[in-house]
């Protein structure tokens, strides 16, 4: 579903993130694909905007400066691309190590307690690859 400021265009009382959101990332026509790789950033933005909407303050548009893909290709191989045109930066063992780090450290859910959950949602924690 298309989103603007993480708000579902067709149903403005709903905010979307991650696999459910096809979000504009800039004013150049780039969009975050409907993928779990954007869930942390989109989730933080959607949470902020849902709270802003409840408080009646302006929403912040979702922004994503860059786009990366790290695709697992089996037991010992992967490929890492950067940019909206997906230029290959790494492949093989080095990309596989990056993929393991992403899967085990970057996108791992926070521990089930309030302080860690709120810390995980901080804008400053989000990475512009």
Where are these regions (language model features)?
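A structure-centric signal for secondary-structure junctions around beta-strands
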Residues: 11, 65-67
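SDR active-site lid
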Residues: 21-23, 30, 57, 63, ...
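C-terminal auxiliary extensions adjacent to catalytic cores
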Residues: 75-129
